[in-house]
Regions:
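Ordered hydrophobic segments in well-structured contexts
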Residues: 96, 108, 212-214, 221-225, ...
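Extended amphipathic alpha-helical segments with heptad-repeat/coiled-coil character used for oligomerization
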Residues: 220-241
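Loop-centered beta-sheet repeat module
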Residues: 167-222
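A broadly conserved detector of short glycine/acidic/proline-rich loop/turn motifs that flank catalytic sites
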Residues: 113, 160, 219, 228, ...
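A contiguous strand-loop segment
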Residues: 3-5, 21, 32, 36-39, ...
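Asparagine-centered polar/low-complexity signal
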Residues: 112, 150, 212, 243-248
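C-terminus-biased signal that marks the final domain/tail of proteins
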Residues: 1-94, 190-203, 218-220, 243-301
């Protein structure tokens, strides 16, 4: 059987201190080092400076965390791949079900994240950084988050909206200057208590990723599509609509005008999940787990 090793991390202290903690961990597991360091001089001085500046403006503390990480490993911060992959210049499924439609009367959030373990951190991380809300979720490039829930019960999940955007081969070139999704998600988890605060912050920050975000707090949820810098937001509450579904294509009319391409499997996964939630009067955790445990086309995996 193919086995993959994962990790649990509990990070506490200042940004710089938790950076040093992570650097010490990687030092003890030296085979992890290559995934953080660029070896081909991909990062120009200007790109590195711009990346640091935008992180300092919108994601305060992450630069300090990276400095602590680099201090522990005795490597230059300029060589960190995070700076190259975070600033972007121009087969996931997820949903939220609000209390009215769940068997426990609590909000349920589901996400199926299809990424190769070869390029994934494989790390579920509980982060308690000074001056930010504590949160737990999966990390990417150690400093980013692919999803999570914070101490106030705010959860954030995402899927690509069409072809993923990035600075590496095979990804769509960004059309605007802005942040990658994993920087945005961590920012939302650390700075926002509820859906309303998250919506306001998303309107402020430059985002280059083409993504579908589902943001939920204990009573409300929002679905946000972002494509080439354009943003469309739909908000629901427990009185009007009980769930939101997203896969890898746009459903809002404004974003569909910009990108109406749909992969067949994305459409099928969307309707599979939507019909399951529509059919169930009361959704259970067990029924959601069954969907993500079954392989496509019967399930979401």
């Amino acid at each position: 059987m193919y086995q993959v090793k994962g990790y649990f991390s509990s990070l506490k202290g200042s940004y710089y201190e938790i950076g040093k903690q992570q650097g010490e961990f990687v030092k003890q597991h030296s085979y992890l080092i290559p995934q953080f360091i660029e070896q081909e001089n991909l990062i120009s001085h200007n790109h590195w400076t711009e990346s640091r500046n935008i992180l300092n403006q919108y994601c305060y503390g992450v630069n300090e965390e990276i400095e602590g990480f680099c201090e522990g490993l005795k490597i230059p911060a300029k060589n960190m791949m995070y700076y190259y992959q975070t600033l972007l210049k121009a087969g996931c499924s997820h949903c939220v079900v609000l209390p009215k439609k769940t068997d426990s009367k609590h909000t349920y959030v589901l996400r199926n994240y299809d990424l190769s373990p070869v390029i994934d951190d494989m790390r579920f991380c509980s982060t308690h950084v000074e001056g930010a809300y504590a949160h737990s979720g999966f990390s990417t490039q150690y400093f980013g988050r692919t999803e999570g829930v914070n101490e106030h019960g705010l959860s954030v999940t995402f899927s690509a909206c069409g072809q993923p955007v990035g600075n590496i081969a095979g990804l769509r070139k960004p059309m605007v200057i802005g942040l990658q999704c994993f920087a945005v998600i961590r920012l939302l988890l650390e700075k926002c208590k509820n859906v309303q605060e998250a919506k306001l912050l998303i309107e402020e920050i430059p985002i280059a990723s083409n993504i579908n975000l589902i943001i939920a707090d204990p009573l409300n949820a929002a679905y946000i599509e972002i494509f080439d810098g354009h943003k469309s937001t739909i908000t629901i509450d427990d009185e009007k609509q009980a769930f939101i579904v997203s896969t890898n294509h746009a459903v809002s009319s404004s974003i569909q005008k910009l990108n109406n391409r749909k992969l067949e499997q994305s459409t099928k996964r969307y309707y599979l999940l939507h019909e399951h939630l529509n059919r169930c009067e009361q959704v259970s955790i067990e029924s959601l787990k069954k969907l993500v445990e079954e392989e496509y086309p019967a399930g979401l995996t």
